[in-house]
From Swiss-Prot:
Biological process, per Gene Ontology: defense response; lipid catabolic process
Sequence motif DGA/G, residues: 216-218
Glycosylated sites: N115
Tissue-by-tissue expression: Tuber.
Pfam families hit by this protein: Patatin
Highest taxon, organism lineage: Eukaryota
Protein name: Patatin group D-3
Family, per entry: Belongs to the patatin family.
Domain PNPLA per the UniProt entry, residue ranges: 32-230
Function as written in the Swiss-Prot or TrEMBL entry: Probable lipolytic acyl hydrolase (LAH), an activity which is thought to be involved in the response of tubers to pathogens.
Protein's organism: Solanum tuberosum (Potato)
Motif (GXGXXG): 36-41
GO cellular component terms, semicolon-separated: vacuole
Stretches of the chain forming a coiled coil according to its record: 361-385
Length: 387
């Protein structure tokens, strides 16, 4: 009798634990963050293609798209472009681009985007005309409010010297942020020295004209927009009961996938204090942006890894990053076919690498685990909505 009672207690405990686990999964907030990096956006594009393919297999649905699974998708610079591609609706109200169309997009348009050189010593390296043309053709007149999930795309307004964050959740308070997606995409990609800043106008709540003078989102925040994406997700909690679980930044209730565009450890080996002490403005200008982007990206990852681990939820955060780029793959504007093929190879090889020295799980295995969580969560929410 005692044995039977103990067995029943054990079953109840298992069921309670299972129920709690599924309830927790259902309440989780899912966030996708995509770094900036110009043509190196091919690397996260390759990763996204793998992830979306896994979701399609798990749900037996060839039409499954990333926007169906993430509550917030954020990006800066080329990450902002990828964000727009997978969240902007087409005529059927589905994302105009599947993940497997991202890399072909770069191969088709990259050589033209990074080929329209101004030929001037003073001024930006590229005129940006082809970039704007292809954005207008693909994104049309779509505005922020039409995005298929919450977005977080950053820029810096050089007239006000303040960051501008384009999100759906801010539109009620700041309707001037309901800009056209092609204006937003160009702005977040307008890296100083590479592309001209972007000027455009929208209307305020009173109908007055509102001006934007914007440059690359990485200048406003950092190349890794993960913290920005989290802050947007947290702000949603103030308005949507479905997000109540993260009102106090409870990372146990959050799934965060952060995709990098690759960095290199060459700087650590190449420059010494003695050598750089002799540098002037031109020498520093050539490398300072890469140095600061790499450092800020590392610190963001370090911070997030620490806080997720502190809440015993390290499995909820995955940073996918190649830290050993070499040669032309380090360049944000080398759109030669050979280099783009190399970037695809970097992304594919990255899937086979371990997540870290302390975690033998490969990125491919980790992404499959994430895909399973995303799939299960979507099914749980769909079942709840059907009652």
């Amino acid at each position: 009798m005692a044995t039977t009672k103990s067995f029943l207690i054990l079953i109840v405990m298992i069921l309670a634990t299972t129920s709690s686990t599924f309830a927790s999964l259902e309440e989780m907030v899912t966030v996708l963050s995509i770094d900036g990096g110009g043509i190196k956006g091919i690397i996260p594009g390759t990763i996204l293609e793998f992830l979306e393919g896994q979701l399609q297999k798990m749900d037996n649905n060839a039409d499954a798209r990333l926007a169906d699974y993430f509550d917030v998708i954020g990006g800066t610079s080329t990450g902002g472009l990828l964000t727009s591609m997978i969240t902007t609706p087409n005529e059927n109200n589905r994302p105009f681009a599947a993940a497997n169309e991202i890399v072909p997009f770069f191969f088709e348009h990259g050589p033209h985007i990074f080929n329209s050189s101004t030929g001037q010593f003073f001024g930006p390296k590229y005129d940006g005309k082809y970039l704007m043309q292809v954005l207008q053709e693909n994104l049309g007149e779509t505005r922020v409010h039409q995005a298929l999930t919450e977005v977080a795309i950053s820029s810096l307004d050089i007239k006000t010297n303040k960051p501008v964050i384009f999100t759906k959740s801010n539109l009620a308070k700041s309707p001037e942020l309901d800009a056209k997606m092609y204006d937003i995409c160009y702005s977040t990609a307008a890296a100083p020295t590479y592309f001209p800043p972007h000027y455009f106008t929208t209307n305020t709540i009173n109908g007055d004209k509102y001006e934007f003078n914007l440059v690359d989102g990485a200048v406003a925040t950092v190349a890794d927009p993960a913290l920005l994406s989290i802050s947007v997700a947290t702000r949603l909690a103030e308005k949507d009961p479905a997000f109540a679980s993260i009102r106090s930044l409870n990372y146990k209730k959050m799934l965060l996938l952060s995709l990098g565009t690759g960095t290199t450890s060459e700087f650590d080996k190449t420059y010494t204090a003695e050598e750089t002490a002799k540098w002037g403005a031109i020498q520093w200008m050539l490398v300072i942006q890469r140095m600061t982007d790499a450092a800020s990206s590392y610190m963001t990852d370090y911070y997030l890894s620490t806080v997720f681990q502190a809440q015993n939820s390290q499995k909820n955060y995955l940073r996918v990053q190649e830290n050993a780029l070499t040669g032309t793959t380090t360049e944000m504007d080398d759109a030669s076919e050979a280099n783009m093929e190399s970037l695809v190879q970097v992304g594919e090889n990255l899937l086979k690498k371990p997540v870290s020295k302390d975690n033998p799980e490969t990125y491919e295995e980790a992404l499959k685990r994430f895909a399973k969580l995303l799939s299960d969560r979507k099914k749980l929410r769909a079942n709840k909505a059907s009652y």
